[in-house]
Amino acid sequence: MRDKLFYFLSKYNFSPRDKIGQNFLIMRDVIIKAVETSEIKKSDVVLEVGPGFGFLTDELSKRAGKVYAIELDKRIIEILENEYNWENVEIIQGDAVKIEWPEFNKVVSNIPYQISSPFTFKLLKHDFEKAVVMYQLEFAKRMVAKPGDRNYSRLSLMVNALANAKIVMKIGRGAFYPKPKVDSALVLIVPKPKDERIELNENLVKALFQHRRKLVSKALKESCHMLGINKKELKTLKNILENVPHAKKRVFELTPEEVKEIEEFLKIQGIIN
């Protein structure tokens, strides 16, 4: 794959753009691991974000019924259309974070790392069976962190509320060209059954995790502006915020269930909708 990559770079006089996260996956073992982990069948419709030079896309096309590949760089799209004759791959030009996604049931992607957070939050709002996504290793660790872990964050909470995530494979920098400055990891994301998912108020979660090391009551008071509470209102609501469920817990120790209890309490008090 390295030889094929350099052939494309030379043939099309192509220079990767670091600004849009163009680090191309060139290790076949990693590509096969991603495809096998996703357990793709002919009945599957797969979404890929950032197809690059089509090495992963080509494997997906052999196994899936349909592949949608979203690519921002028009130069890449021109190369893919020239070099491959896929009948079941539809390339969509655009920013994956901003455009509407087609319907799919599986995701397999080596995404640009700078869109990791908005991509993941957008993904979790969709119905799908399984996603296998390449992330920066440190981001992946935050995704799979549990309450109380040093990596536990807003991301950890939101992922844990809606899905089960685990690191499938850690990947060194040599698996990409150009080499990124960070290590990577393949992450498997499987949505929880609908009756087990916990839909959380995103503004509340953001407000809490602005101060993840602080006590819940203090975090809410210090982030009250994010909940639409001004300083004058805070004086009258101070006692309520000090008596929310789990007020004396630190934010990074909260489970999704506990955040939901805080949310329901604040709704009853008329503080949030």
From Swiss-Prot:
The keyword Transferase applies. It is found in: Cytoplasm. GO terms for molecular function: RNA binding; rRNA (adenine-N6,N6-)-dimethyltransferase activity. It comes from the Archaea. The keyword RNA-binding applies. Gene3D superfamilies: Ribosomal RNA adenine dimethylase-like, domain 2, Vaccinia Virus protein VP39. One of its GO terms (cellular component) is cytoplasm. S-adenosyl-L-methionine binds at residues 23, 25, 50, 71, 95, 110. Its EC number is 2.1.1.-. CDD domains: AdoMet_MTases. Keywords: Cytoplasm, Methyltransferase, RNA-binding, rRNA processing, S-adenosyl-L-methionine, Transferase. It holds the Pfam family RrnaAD. Belongs to the class I-like SAM-binding methyltransferase superfamily. rRNA adenine N(6)-methyltransferase family. RsmA subfamily. Specifically dimethylates two adjacent adenosines in the loop of a conserved hairpin near the 3'-end of 16S rRNA in the 30S particle. May play a critical role in biogenesis of 30S subunits. This is Probable ribosomal RNA small subunit methyltransferase A. It comes from Pyrococcus furiosus (strain ATCC 43587 / DSM 3638 / JCM 8422 / Vc1).
